[in-house]
Amino acid sequence: MTSHRGRRAASIENDALRVTVLEEGGHIAEIADKASGINPLWRPDWPSIEPSTYDPSRHAVYGGGVDASLLAGIMGHNLCLDIFGGPSAEEAHAGLPVHGEVSTARFEIERTPASLTMRARLPLAQLTFERRIDLAGGAVRIRELVENLSATDRPLAWTQHVTLGPPFLQHGRTEFRASGRRSKVFEGVFGPADYLASGAEFDWPLAPRQDADGGVRDLRVYTDAGASSAYTAHQMDPALEHAYFVAFSPASRLAFGYVWRRENFPWMGLWEENRARPGAPWNKRAVTSGWEFGVSPFPESRRQMLERGPLFGTPTWGWIHARGRLSVEYWAILQNRAAIPESLPWPV
């Protein structure tokens, strides 16, 4: 076990990359290019602590909301499992955090020179979760297994919440590509600096603005606004076996992205928090771009997820059988590039 920004962690590396995961929360904290030292993943500017040490009476810096225990330890690529979004009032009273207990769980980690295997038991959700990470040059192979410990079939939310941040992420410069098709803006108010038309449906990547003149926002370039907030949901192209997103930093000449099987994760959410949220721990300072691929289009309660029904003909939640298991495989790729690739192929 090693330390990363004051947190208990484990790392593996090869000539090209270093990958670091956190013991508590299981977050993939960095996928760093060793030549430049740049990690495209988001590192919050507030102090990071082990979620098990979070105490609302002593840690007002993380805010007083139901998401405080999550925010106390969040970093990089975090997992949303069993729910994607906030718990109901009753679930919160029973101890369930935003995005599920996995983001505050303690993981057992086995390390070899080229692989990490992480395991956690989720007693509230009655699930177990396992993730194996292997390095292959400039690519990271990630395999996950979810097991249902209960005797009942059940719906399931399962989302990979990948968040990019500076210095890789730059206003008006960082570019994006994705295999999106039909898309929809979050319904209602998402943040204090919303600028997209609430609930509007559109084709990737041109999202309708709130402007009366019918303007659009090209989601293929990070915003250059002083402050902004947005969330859009994107159906991954049904005609493709593999879905992907890729981001490119002209300053570092690095392309970073993920590729996965569309049948596993048919949705991707694009989250923009750009110096907009005033409360702790955000304090109008965070600059993020979240690329959240999973089985659900929107962060919402369990009931809302179930009541939504199919969107654009695509299911909006997953299913796991009694005592059943579900497994997925996906890749993260970090490459030196002179320009953004228009797609991200599945590694051979």
Feature map (PLM): residue ranges:
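Surface-exposed acidic/polar loop and edge beta-strand patches at domain peripheries
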Residues: 1-141, 152-348
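Asparagine-centered strand-capping/turn motif at beta-strand->loop junctions
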Residues: 145-150
